[in-house]
Amino acid sequence: MKFEDYQRFTFRRDGRILVCSFSGNAVNAVDARMHDELAELFVDLQHDEDSDLIVLTGENRAFCAGGDFDWFDEQINDPRKFRAIAYDAKRIVSGLLDLEKPIIARLNGAAAGLGATIALLCDVIIADEAAKIGDPHVKVGLVAGDGGAIIWPQLIGFARAKELLMTGDLLSATEAARMGLINYAVPTDQLDAKVAEIAGKILGNPRWAVRWTKMTANITLKQIMVSTSDAAVAYETLSNMTADRKEAVAAFRERRPMNLTGE
């Protein structure tokens, strides 16, 4: 795997474990470069011959806090830039679901928007109990078309998922674990030990039994993705062109209530 090709991720090996870390700004917000790299990342991880398990985590104070607001402004001012990422948005989700190697999400901090989607598409999610997780697409005027509307209902049911997706509320890691959205929420000083424990248990089993069990479990998710992702991305693309989308981003930047018109 050519680590040097990546600017928004860092990599570290621990035996047969490859630790892959978001490494952007202070909250690892997704910009154009990171989005491009995400579309390639999981394919490259699949072909890395020196790893059997991936740990995905974040540097700085967040796991991945969703979209970068400067990038949002670019997409609002030139909707062609949003349309241009539609194909890669689907590749990110399919890349995760097609990755045969088990992948553990180590939530060291906030996972929001696309960051939450990526975490929830991982096989095991272990969070610092101080972390927050949620999908606030609606709070910035967007449909959760990047996979959020696909994976949340599968994990916690449609009623809870739609409430959280339509309010954009964030959950504490403890609450997320309680409702089954993630696997574990642990104290900060126990996070690495818990990740190592689960990784060790997985790696203690025959490689191909583990990989193909994961692939079998992912069949239904892949069928759902194929049947819904085109519409989900199309709805998100349309929402980027609304007046309320522009207002929502401006209000967030200016730390004021939104003045929504329904347009």
Question: Whereabouts are the PLM-identified features?
Answer:
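Conserved CoA-thioester-binding segment of acyl-CoA-metabolizing enzymes
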Residues: 1-59, 94
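Terminal low-complexity tails and localization/encapsulation signals of metabolic enzymes
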Residues: 1-6, 250-263
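Glycine- (often His-adjacent) and acidic-residue-rich active-site loop
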Residues: 3, 58-95, 111, 141, ...
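Crotonase-fold acyl-CoA enzyme core
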Residues: 94-210, 233, 237, 241-242, ...
